């Protein structure tokens, strides 16, 4: 997460109403403790800023600087209850690799957390790597591994309204486990699709963000914006 684009994206999220900002990973670039200390300052806001690790992150430093916890190597999973909606921020990282996986501990945590909710409490699940192909060789080489395990788990939890991910550096929408799958836009550089030219990275695009609106019918509507 580069500092100035991150500040601009967070400022763009300061809207009136019941607001929380999920950040699906890559809080740091190199996993250095100093990067997280800077990020902690930027991510301080008058509304909840929810984070999970990405493939560039280091769990011990993430825990210490952003959560105030003792450093540890286990998955960094958190649950947040925001004005009637439960948001599960899940750790899908495999240390040292771009691909992701929700390991047995995390899948069990997701199941236990959702089981504890009433069926009329809507939930969102967020993690780093998309569980489906986005039809670009770069993000598709670093997808979530074994996504069928999560899909099977979600069959027992109809209160999950949508799945939110990042990682791809391009805003995208698809479906997963009969639910909306929303991929957040890039804060730093934007991925160019194969039909947009030979250069894979467009570093001139401004940072982006997505506004998610979850209504009383559990319908998720997403509006994408760039921050100029």
Question: Model regions: which residues?
Answer:
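N-terminal active-site segment of His-dependent metallophosphoesterases
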Residues: 1-38, 134
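His/acidic metal-ligating clusters that form di-metal
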Residues: 8-20, 100-180, 208-211, 218-220
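Hydrophobic/aromatic beta-strand patches that form the interior of the parallel beta-sheet core
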Residues: 22, 50-52, 88, 164, ...
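Active-site metal-binding loops of divalent metal-dependent hydrolases
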Residues: 25-27, 55-56, 92-93, 129-130, ...
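Extended active-site neighborhood of metal-dependent phosphoesterases/phosphodiesterases
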Residues: 32-119, 149, 155-159, 177, ...
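Active-site-proximal beta-strand elements of phosphoester/diester hydrolases
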Residues: 84-94, 124-128, 179-185, 223-225
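Short acidic, glycine/proline-rich loop/turn micro-motifs
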Residues: 92-93, 135-139, 193-196
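Binuclear metal-dependent phosphoesterase catalytic core
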Residues: 153, 175-228
């Amino acid at each position: 997460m580069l500092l100035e684009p991150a500040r601009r994206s967070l400022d763009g999220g300061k809207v009136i109403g019941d607001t929380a900002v999920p950040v699906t990973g890559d809080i740091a670039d190199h996993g250095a403790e100093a990067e997280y200390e800077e990020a902690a300052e930027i991510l301080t806001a008058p509304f909840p800023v929810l984070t999970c690790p990405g493939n560039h992150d280091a769990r011990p430093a993430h825990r210490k600087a952003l959560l105030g916890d003792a450093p540890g190597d286990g998955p960094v999973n958190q649950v947040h209850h925001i004005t009637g909606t439960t948001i599960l921020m899940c750790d899908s990282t495999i240390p040292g690799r771009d691909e992701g996986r929700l390991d047995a501990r995390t899948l069990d945590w997701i199941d236990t957390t959702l089981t504890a909710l009433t069926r009329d409490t809507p939930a969102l699940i967020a993690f780093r790597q998309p569980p489906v192909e986005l039809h670009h060789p770069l993000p598709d080489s670093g997808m979530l591994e074994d996504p069928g395990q999560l899909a099977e788990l979600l069959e027992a939890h109809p209160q999950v309204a949508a799945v939110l991910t990042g990682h791809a550096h391009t805003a995208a929408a698809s479906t997963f486990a009969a639910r909306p799958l929303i991929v957040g836009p890039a804060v730093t550089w934007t991925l160019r699709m194969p039909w947009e030219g030979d250069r894979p990275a467009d570093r001139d695009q401004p940072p982006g963000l997505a506004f998610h609106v979850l209504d009383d019918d559990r319908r998720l509507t997403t509006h994408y914006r760039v921050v100029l």
